[in-house]
A protein has these predicted regions:
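Non-catalytic accessory regions flanking glycosidase/transglycosidase catalytic cores in CAZymes
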Residues: 1-223, 231-239, 263-264, 268-308, ...
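Active-site His/acidic residue clusters
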Residues: 243-259
Length: 507
């Protein structure tokens, strides 16, 4: 007999309206993300601007509302002036973060054109590593000021009359990391970010800022960094950045799927730190979170080290090309559940990255088409069906033991209510690798609703991957959920991602 779990989903248990930007992503000038990724002139599937139409279509399928650009570590040695103006006059640069050669063929204008085609906004990251206040202000003037000044007129001269109106700006990237070009102490960075934000707001009061938090929760200055940086910047910024990546280097799948609990704890700790600074400053303002780098990342580490150490200074080398397996898709689904459950404070999130570089979308390096990695599907489902109000489910689940995270629940879930569309979606993962779970869900508050579909992503092989022309992992629609007198009975197969959708009976 299958194990049993119980859950209550009630429209009164509201967490927050979900900001659609939590389904954002990230494109860095790194590896084949830009060149041979979004941009490949001469390819039979590219448009007149050189952008891959098949890639744009897949990004639209994911429905990515915002894309962080141009980095990442890349941005801390980025000279934005190199990326504008006539392409033939743009210089090649040594790209120090990834020991590559940047040709600047795709720059601000080109990327904005691509983002428009993909129905995405651009979240601009500025260089506070090797540069500072003056250059950040010049870049903002170039992008957002209407005209009549040096840099806004330069934009017009370059063929863009109307300002771009970029709204969301990152004040550097991972400035606590010793690997960062221009790495700073917490107070050095806090003061620089504070003064940069103040100056930029004088140019465009409508913009909002993301300030760098810790690069991950294992950094030696974790939490102390947030305290010091926010003590300087709290009154001037809108979001604190979080980053995390997980891997399964020990090949312990059971413990690997517990790492979403670590992400949940990370967010709780950051919220507590933000609220401590809020109290210290006697502020009435909440600090929101931008989880602008998150994913699984470890498969490509050895190959990446070989390229950067033994074959440096290439244009678009195949860096960070993780090929994701099925268990990676399960963890990505679990991480999405965590983000939705924290939608009261997490307002922006970026799956890192989008194309070819630790990405849901890959392009064939031999000139072929594009394909979907296993992680494409949980992200697509969450982005497509996770719009509305996040509901906090009350879950009673059986548990199992892990090697590094103690006893964890078999079932992790969250629900989203889209009142406008009259839809309820439950996202659930059975992370028990051996046993199916019957999930009984009380949905009596949604009177007149019926089961529309139960989508499942599952595989008997946790290590199976997709490849160009070979889609081994893809979702299917099942009959595994029934409804009777306001209670759902759902069979959650072992190691499965589940999307259970309810709609109003008149639809």
């Amino acid at each position: 007999m299958a194990k049993q779990a119980k859950m209550v989903v009630d429209k009164a248990f509201s967490i927050s309206k979900i900001d659609k930007r939590i389904y954002g992503s990230f494109i860095e000038h790194l590896g084949r993300a830009v060149y041979d990724g979004i941009y490949q002139p001469g390819h039979p599937l590219s448009n007149a601007d050189g952008f891959r139409k098949d890639v744009i279509d897949l990004v639209k399928e994911l429905d990515v509302p915002i894309v962080r650009y141009p980095g990442g570590n890349f941005v801390s040695n980025f000279y934005w002036e190199d990326s504008v103006g006539p392409v033939e006059e743009r210089p090649h640069r040594l790209e120090l973060a990834w020991k590559s050669l940047e040709k600047n063929e795709v720059g601000l204008h080109e990327f904005k054109k691509w983002a428009d085609a993909a129905n995405s906004e651009v979240m601009v990251a500025g260089n506070l590593g090797t540069r500072g206040i003056t250059d950040a202000c010049n870049l903002l003037e170039y992008c957002n000021h209407p005209g009549g000044t040096k840099y806004s007129d330069l934009r017009i001269k370059h063929g863009q009359k109307d300002p771009y109106g970029f709204k969301t700006w990152c004040l550097g990237n991972e400035m606590d990391g010793p690997w960062q070009i221009g790495h700073k102490t917490m107070d050095e960075y806090g003061r620089l970010a504070e003064e940069t934000a103040k100056a930029m707001k004088l140019i465009d009061p409508s913009i909002e800022f993301v300030v760098c938090g810790s690069s991950n929760k294992d950094m030696p200055t974790f939490a102390l960094w947030e305290d010091h940086v926010l003590s300087h910047t709290y009154d001037y910024v809108d979001y604190l950045s979080l980053h995390t990546y997980y891997g399964n280097r020990s090949d312990d799948s059971n413990d690997f799927l517990a790492k979403s609990d670590d992400m949940d704890e990370f967010i709780h700790t950051i919220i507590a730190t933000c609220d401590y600074v809020k109290a210290k400053k006697r502020s009435k303002k909440n600090m929101y979170l931008s989880f602008d780098e998150w994913n699984v990342w470890y498969h490509s580490n050895a190959a990446d080290n070989d390229i950067t150490e033994n074959h440096p200074w290439q244009i678009a080398p195949p860096l960070l090309e993780d090929i994701y397996n099925f268990e990676d898709a399960l963890l990505v689904g679990l991480m999405l559940i965590v983000l939705i459950r924290h939608s009261d404070r997490v307002k922006v999130a970026c799956l890192a990255q989008l194309i070819n570089v630790i990405a849901p979308i890959m392009t064939d390096p031999n000139g072929g088409g594009s394909w979907k990695q296993t992680i494409f599907y949980p992200f697509m489902h969450a982005s497509k069906y996770g719009r509305g109000v996040a509901l906090q489910p009350v879950i009673s689940s059986t548990e199992h033991e892990t090697s590094g995270h103690g006893s964890i629940t078999d079932v992790e879930a969250v629900a989203v209510y889209n009142e406008e569309k009259e839809e309820v979606t439950i996202f659930a993962v059975n992370r028990n690798l051996k046993e199916d779970i019957v999930l009984n869900t009380d949905v009596r508050s949604f009177e007149g609703y019926r089961v529309a579909e139960h989508i499942v992503l599952e595989s008997d092989d946790l290590k199976v991957v997709n490849a160009f022309g070979q889609e081994n992992v893809k979702p299917k629609t099942t009959q595994q959920t029934t409804m009777d007198n306001g209670e759902l009975t759902s069979m959650l197969h072992k190691a499965s991602w589940n999307v259970i959708r309810l709609v109003k009976d008149n639809k």
